[in-house]
């Protein structure tokens, strides 16, 4: 997903997820989600400038892999294949991307493959730190996800917890373009969302005792 598509879809996804988690009865979940979707469609279609912008963002017929973002993704994967265990090193994408073995990646935008990072932090971790780094990272996220699923099964509807779950889900959704997780500015938001959700989980645990 490009940046604009990613931002708009993640906003919608976060809103829908909040409705799904906040409302208890399944029937009301469906009704609320339908009404929210209807409201979005009406809002987009009745405001001419918004509708034109929406069409421009989503009507692209270009294959994702033939965009500059697709070139970044393919490049990071090839870097990982060359350094599968420990990766090429943190924040080395900018140096690796210009090397000759990456000139023939399967993308029409191969000449645009170089950047400071691959614009998806999962791929960034994979190419920079290899299987070891991504394995540790995914293990940690899975532990958080297990706690979220546990609280969902307990039908806990604490509003602060639900908001933190939505933020966590939006920030760590894998299928989107992102900033670099190893830059101080971007990593701040990822770390903050983790701190918030872990705090809320522990806070709810204490309340249940």
Give, region by region, the residue ranges found by the protein language model.
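Juxtamembrane transmembrane-helix termini
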Residues: 1, 5-8, 21-27, 55, ...
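Helix-loop-helix junctions and helix-breaking kinks within/between transmembrane helices
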Residues: 1-21, 47, 130-133, 179-180
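A membrane-periplasm/extracellular boundary helix in multi-pass inner-membrane enzymes
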Residues: 1-2, 22-65, 74-82, 90, ...
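Alpha-helical transmembrane segments
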Residues: 2, 6, 40-47, 137-141, ...
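Membrane-interface catalytic loops of GT-C/OST-like multi-pass glycosylation enzymes that act
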Residues: 2-10, 115-120, 176-189
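Transmembrane alpha-helices of multi-pass inner-membrane enzymes
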Residues: 15-16, 137-140, 164-176, 180-209
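Hydrophobic transmembrane alpha-helices and their immediate junctions
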Residues: 16, 20, 29-30, 35, ...
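Long extracytoplasmic/lumenal interhelical loops at the membrane interface
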Residues: 60-74, 81-82, 86-129
């Amino acid at each position: 997903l490009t940046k604009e598509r990613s931002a708009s879809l993640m906003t919608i996804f976060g809103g829908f997820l909040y409705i799904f988690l906040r409302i208890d009865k399944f029937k009301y979940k469906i009704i609320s989600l339908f009404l929210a979707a209807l409201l979005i469609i009406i809002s987009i279609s009745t405001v001419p400038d918004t509708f034109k912008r929406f069409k421009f963002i989503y009507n692209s017929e270009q294959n994702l892999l033939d965009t500059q973002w697709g070139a970044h993704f393919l490049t990071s994967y090839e870097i990982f294949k060359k350094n599968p265990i420990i990766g090429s090193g943190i924040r080395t994408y900018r140096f690796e991307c210009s090397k000759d073995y990456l000139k023939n990646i399967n993308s029409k935008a191969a000449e645009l493959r170089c950047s400071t990072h691959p614009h998806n932090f999962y791929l960034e971790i994979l190419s920079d730190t290899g299987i070891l780094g991504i394995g540790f990272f995914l293990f940690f996220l899975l532990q958080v996800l297990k706690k979220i699923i546990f609280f969902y099964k307990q039908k806990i509807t604490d509003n602060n917890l639900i908001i933190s779950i939505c933020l966590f889900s939006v920030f760590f959704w894998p299928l989107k373009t992102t900033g670099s997780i190893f830059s101080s500015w971007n990593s701040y938001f990822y770390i903050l969302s983790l701190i918030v959700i872990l705090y809320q989980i522990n806070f709810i645990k204490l309340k249940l005792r």
